[in-house]
Amino acid sequence: LSLLWVNPSLAKLGSAEIVGDPIVNNNKVTLRIKVKEHNGRPALDLQDENFRLIVDGQPVKFKPQDWKSSRETTPPPVWIVFLLDYSGSMNTKDSKGTSKLTGAIDAIRSFIFATAKRNGDTRVVVVPFGEGQGVAANCNRPVTNDEIDRFFPAGDFKIESQLKRLAAGKPCASTNIYDPITETVKFFTNPEDGRFTVPEGEIKPRTSIILLSDGYQNKVGEPASFKRLISFLEKQESVIIHTLGYGLTPEELGRKYRLNRTAKRSDIGIGKPVKEEEFVDKEKLSKIAQVTSGVAEFSPDAQAVSEKLDIFLDAILGEYEISYLEPNPERGSKRQIKVIVTSDKDPKIESKPKDYNIGVFGRSLPRNHRLLMVFGIGTILSLGGFLPFWFWGKQLKREVLER
C-alpha cells in the first residue's frame, strides 16, 4: 500500500534524519530515524516499505519484523524543559474567553499525562519566566540552573503540585524570551553533566525545550539580542526547541483591526491600532524553532494549545527504528549508512549519512558453522590423542610376542 493511500491527508515529506549514532551489537546494527513532513511536523504514518537503507553505496535489506513504527518504538531517554511565559498578559483571556494562564497550564497537564502513558524514561520540568525590575521586582522570574534542574518523571505528583502553584499565581512580569532560552541550552550542553553525554554506542538522551509565550521580546536592543541568540543556537545541534505562540497570529490581528495587511511590531504601543498584550512575535518564534530543527505552532485558544502540544510530543518521541545485519563485516572497519524515504507521489528524501564502526571482534559465525568447527576440532583432538596411543599399544604387543 502506498503511503498516501494509507493516509490521504498526510502532508508532503520534508526531511529524514538518523538520530544519534547507529547502535552496533555484533553483526546487528540498529538505527533510530526521524521523518518530518514539509511543514516541519512529524510524519508518523509511514510503513516499512517506505524505507530503504544504503550502506557504503549498496542497498541493504531488512526484515519487516525488524522495522518498528514511531508508535511501537520504546522512547529514548528524554529531558523536557517547559518554558512558560509568566508575563502580565497571561492574565488576559484568549479568543474563547479562557484565561491564558489557565489554558496553558491545563494543556501542559494534558501533555505530561500523555507523555507518562508512552512508558518511556521522560523527565519534565516547568520553568516560568518573566522579567521584573524596580517597583515590579517581585514579578521577576529568572531562569537559572537551579530553577531548571528540578526534573521529575512524567506523571510524578510533584509536577502537578507545581502546576497548581503556578495556576494560583498572578503573572506580572514583562516578556524576556531570549535569555531563558540561552540559559536552558547552556544547561543542556554542559559537557560535565553526565546525564546528557553518554559513551559512544549508547542511545543519547533527547533534550528538548518547549517555549510557550503569548508575547514578544520587549527589552531595549531586541534586534541585536535576537541576532546573538540565533548565532548561539546555530552553533549547537543537541537541543531542539519547539515554540508555541498563544494568541492571534499577525494575519488574524490585521483582520481584527482592519489593517488590510499583516500586523507588525510597529502597530503596537501608545496611540497605535493593536493592543500591546495581543501581539505575539510569530516570525521570531518560528525562526527559533527552525534553526534548532523544532516545530513552530500557533494557538488562538486553550483547546488548540493542547492539540499543538500533542504535535510536539510526537515530534519529541516519534522515531522509527530499523535493525539489519551488517552485510560485509570486517573487524575494526568503518561503514557509512544513509536512509532513503519514499512515497508514491512525493520525491524521495535522503538522510545525511552516518558513520559507524564494526567491533574488533567482528560478528559471530552462524550456529551451523560453529557446530561444524567444534565437531572438527573435537575429531582432530580425539584422533590426535587416540591414534598414537593405539600404535604404541600395538608395538608393545608385538614386542611381547617376539620374546
Language-model segments: residues:
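…and closely analogous acidic/polar surface helices at protein-protein or active-site interfaces
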Residues: D66-W79, G88-V124, F151-F152, P171
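Bacterial N-terminal signal peptides
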Residues: L1-L4
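Short, charged loop segments at secondary-structure junctions
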Residues: P76-I80, M90-T92, A116-N119, G130-T182, ...
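Solvent-exposed loop/turn segments at secondary-structure junctions
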Residues: Y86-M90, G130-V135, A173, G215-K219, ...
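Von Willebrand factor
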Residues: I148-R206, K219-V220, T243-G254, V280, ...
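C-terminal "exit" segments of structured domains
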Residues: N25-N27, P300-L401
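Acidic, polar low-complexity linker/tail segments
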Residues: K12-D94
